[in-house]
Amino acid sequence: MARAVAGFGDWKRVGRRFNDLMKTFLWVALAIAAASAKLEGVSEAYPRTSPGDLELKTLPAARWMRTESSKDYFAGDNGLFMKLFRYIDSNKIPMTAPVEAGITPGTMVFYMDDASAKRADLAETPQVKLSSVPERRVAAIGIRGSYSRENYDEGLAELRAWLAKRTDVKAAGEPYAVYWNSPFVPFFFKQSEVHIPVVPTK
Protein backbone atom coordinates (compact mmCIF):
# COMPACT_ATOMS: atom_id res chain seq x y z
CA MET A 1 0.00 0.00 0.00
CA ALA A 2 2.78 2.43 0.92
CA ARG A 3 4.43 1.74 -2.43
CA ALA A 4 1.15 2.46 -4.25
CA VAL A 5 0.70 5.75 -2.37
CA ALA A 6 4.28 6.76 -3.20
CA GLY A 7 3.64 5.94 -6.84
CA PHE A 8 0.50 8.07 -6.82
CA GLY A 9 2.51 10.95 -5.38
CA ASP A 10 5.03 10.63 -8.19
CA TRP A 11 2.26 10.86 -10.77
CA LYS A 12 0.86 13.97 -9.07
CA ARG A 13 4.28 15.63 -9.29
CA VAL A 14 4.54 14.68 -12.97
CA GLY A 15 1.08 16.13 -13.55
CA ARG A 16 2.00 19.42 -11.85
CA ARG A 17 5.19 19.68 -13.91
CA PHE A 18 3.24 19.02 -17.09
CA ASN A 19 0.74 21.76 -16.19
CA ASP A 20 3.58 24.17 -15.46
CA LEU A 21 5.19 23.37 -18.81
CA MET A 22 1.90 23.90 -20.63
CA LYS A 23 1.39 27.27 -18.93
CA THR A 24 4.93 28.31 -19.89
CA PHE A 25 4.37 27.17 -23.47
CA LEU A 26 1.14 29.16 -23.72
CA TRP A 27 2.78 32.31 -22.35
CA VAL A 28 5.68 31.97 -24.80
CA ALA A 29 3.26 31.37 -27.68
CA LEU A 30 1.25 34.46 -26.73
CA ALA A 31 4.42 36.57 -26.45
CA ILE A 32 5.62 35.40 -29.87
CA ALA A 33 2.22 36.08 -31.41
CA ALA A 34 2.13 39.58 -29.94
CA ALA A 35 5.66 40.40 -31.10
CA SER A 36 4.95 38.96 -34.52
CA ALA A 37 1.80 41.02 -34.91
CA LYS A 38 3.70 44.16 -33.96
CA LEU A 39 6.54 43.51 -36.41
CA GLU A 40 4.23 42.33 -39.19
CA GLY A 41 2.18 45.54 -39.13
CA VAL A 42 4.67 47.45 -41.27
CA SER A 43 4.42 49.27 -44.57
CA GLU A 44 5.51 47.30 -47.63
CA ALA A 45 7.66 48.89 -50.34
CA TYR A 46 5.99 46.97 -53.18
CA PRO A 47 3.52 44.10 -53.76
CA ARG A 48 4.58 40.56 -52.92
CA THR A 49 4.96 37.76 -55.44
CA SER A 50 2.78 34.91 -54.19
CA PRO A 51 4.52 31.62 -53.30
CA GLY A 52 4.91 29.45 -56.40
CA ASP A 53 4.35 32.34 -58.84
CA LEU A 54 6.91 33.64 -61.34
CA GLU A 55 6.49 37.10 -62.81
CA LEU A 56 8.06 40.29 -64.08
CA LYS A 57 7.40 43.30 -61.89
CA THR A 58 8.47 46.89 -61.50
CA LEU A 59 9.86 48.04 -58.15
CA PRO A 60 9.33 51.73 -57.34
CA ALA A 61 12.09 54.26 -56.76
CA ALA A 62 13.07 54.26 -53.10
CA ARG A 63 15.42 55.44 -50.38
CA TRP A 64 17.65 52.71 -48.93
CA MET A 65 19.72 51.94 -45.87
CA ARG A 66 22.40 49.40 -46.77
CA THR A 67 25.12 47.50 -44.94
CA GLU A 68 27.54 44.79 -45.98
CA SER A 69 29.74 42.01 -44.65
CA SER A 70 32.84 40.26 -45.93
CA LYS A 71 31.05 36.99 -45.18
CA ASP A 72 28.46 35.12 -47.19
CA TYR A 73 24.90 36.18 -46.34
CA PHE A 74 24.02 32.72 -45.07
CA ALA A 75 26.93 32.69 -42.60
CA GLY A 76 25.27 32.59 -39.21
CA ASP A 77 27.31 35.45 -37.76
CA ASN A 78 27.22 38.00 -40.59
CA GLY A 79 25.77 40.68 -38.24
CA LEU A 80 23.94 42.48 -41.04
CA PHE A 81 20.48 42.71 -39.51
CA MET A 82 21.65 44.17 -36.20
CA LYS A 83 23.72 46.88 -37.91
CA LEU A 84 20.62 48.14 -39.69
CA PHE A 85 18.31 47.60 -36.75
CA ARG A 86 20.53 49.68 -34.46
CA TYR A 87 20.53 52.45 -37.07
CA ILE A 88 16.75 52.62 -37.45
CA ASP A 89 16.25 52.30 -33.70
CA SER A 90 18.63 55.14 -32.86
CA ASN A 91 17.14 57.36 -35.59
CA LYS A 92 13.51 56.46 -34.85
CA ILE A 93 12.88 55.12 -38.36
CA PRO A 94 9.93 52.70 -38.66
CA MET A 95 10.63 49.13 -39.72
CA THR A 96 9.40 48.35 -43.22
CA ALA A 97 9.21 45.30 -45.45
CA PRO A 98 10.74 43.63 -47.29
CA VAL A 99 14.38 43.18 -46.32
CA GLU A 100 16.58 42.54 -49.36
CA ALA A 101 19.80 40.53 -49.15
CA GLY A 102 22.73 40.07 -51.51
CA ILE A 103 24.41 36.70 -51.05
CA THR A 104 28.16 36.88 -51.85
CA PRO A 105 29.40 39.09 -50.33
CA GLY A 106 26.59 39.43 -47.83
CA THR A 107 24.61 42.66 -48.02
CA MET A 108 21.32 43.78 -46.53
CA VAL A 109 18.95 46.60 -47.41
CA PHE A 110 16.14 48.18 -45.39
CA TYR A 111 13.67 50.47 -47.15
CA MET A 112 12.79 53.84 -45.64
CA ASP A 113 9.15 54.75 -45.22
CA ASP A 114 7.98 57.84 -47.14
CA ALA A 115 8.35 60.23 -44.20
CA SER A 116 11.87 59.07 -43.29
CA ALA A 117 12.97 59.27 -46.92
CA LYS A 118 12.35 63.04 -46.77
CA ARG A 119 14.33 63.65 -43.58
CA ALA A 120 17.41 65.84 -43.93
CA ASP A 121 18.89 64.93 -40.54
CA LEU A 122 19.78 61.33 -41.39
CA ALA A 123 23.48 60.71 -41.93
CA GLU A 124 25.56 57.75 -43.00
CA THR A 125 27.72 55.87 -40.53
CA PRO A 126 30.79 53.70 -41.13
CA GLN A 127 28.46 50.68 -41.14
CA VAL A 128 25.28 51.99 -42.78
CA LYS A 129 25.18 53.74 -46.15
CA LEU A 130 22.21 55.70 -47.52
CA SER A 131 21.24 55.87 -51.17
CA SER A 132 18.36 56.61 -53.52
CA VAL A 133 17.57 53.94 -56.11
CA PRO A 134 15.56 54.41 -59.31
CA GLU A 135 12.63 52.33 -60.47
CA ARG A 136 13.75 48.78 -61.29
CA ARG A 137 12.41 45.91 -63.37
CA VAL A 138 12.95 42.39 -62.01
CA ALA A 139 12.04 38.78 -62.61
CA ALA A 140 10.67 37.33 -59.37
CA ILE A 141 9.69 33.99 -57.87
CA GLY A 142 7.65 33.66 -54.67
CA ILE A 143 8.71 31.11 -52.04
CA ARG A 144 7.12 29.76 -48.87
CA GLY A 145 9.26 28.24 -46.14
CA SER A 146 12.36 28.88 -44.06
CA TYR A 147 14.91 31.50 -45.07
CA SER A 148 17.55 28.90 -45.89
CA ARG A 149 20.24 28.67 -48.54
CA GLU A 150 18.53 25.54 -49.88
CA ASN A 151 15.23 27.36 -50.48
CA TYR A 152 17.07 30.32 -52.01
CA ASP A 153 19.10 28.09 -54.36
CA GLU A 154 16.04 26.11 -55.43
CA GLY A 155 14.09 29.28 -56.14
CA LEU A 156 16.99 30.81 -58.05
CA ALA A 157 17.38 27.73 -60.25
CA GLU A 158 13.67 27.73 -61.10
CA LEU A 159 13.68 31.48 -61.79
CA ARG A 160 16.73 31.24 -64.07
CA ALA A 161 15.13 28.40 -66.05
CA TRP A 162 11.93 30.45 -66.46
CA LEU A 163 13.85 33.56 -67.48
CA ALA A 164 15.95 31.64 -70.02
CA LYS A 165 12.78 30.76 -71.94
CA ARG A 166 11.68 34.38 -72.31
CA THR A 167 12.54 36.42 -75.38
CA ASP A 168 11.34 39.82 -74.16
CA VAL A 169 13.82 40.38 -71.30
CA LYS A 170 17.25 39.21 -70.15
CA ALA A 171 19.18 39.19 -66.88
CA ALA A 172 20.98 42.45 -66.13
CA GLY A 173 22.40 42.03 -62.63
CA GLU A 174 23.08 39.73 -59.72
CA PRO A 175 20.23 37.80 -58.06
CA TYR A 176 19.25 38.60 -54.49
CA ALA A 177 16.85 37.42 -51.80
CA VAL A 178 13.75 39.23 -50.56
CA TYR A 179 12.39 38.48 -47.07
CA TRP A 180 8.94 39.58 -45.93
CA ASN A 181 8.41 38.23 -42.42
CA SER A 182 9.80 38.76 -38.94
CA PRO A 183 11.89 36.08 -37.19
CA PHE A 184 8.89 35.28 -34.96
CA VAL A 185 6.80 33.90 -37.83
CA PRO A 186 6.83 30.06 -38.02
CA PHE A 187 8.86 28.80 -40.98
CA PHE A 188 5.81 27.33 -42.71
CA PHE A 189 4.20 30.80 -42.86
CA LYS A 190 7.31 32.68 -43.99
CA GLN A 191 7.30 34.25 -47.46
CA SER A 192 10.34 35.21 -49.48
CA GLU A 193 11.32 35.87 -53.07
CA VAL A 194 14.32 35.69 -55.35
CA HIS A 195 14.80 38.58 -57.78
CA ILE A 196 16.96 38.94 -60.87
CA PRO A 197 17.24 42.45 -62.39
CA VAL A 198 16.20 42.46 -66.06
CA VAL A 199 16.25 44.75 -69.10
CA PRO A 200 14.42 44.46 -72.43
CA THR A 201 16.03 42.23 -75.04
CA LYS A 202 17.20 44.27 -78.02
Regions from the PLM with identified roles:
Residues 2-7:
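Extreme N-terminal basic, low-complexity initiation segments
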Residues 11-202:
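A solvent-exposed interaction/effector surface
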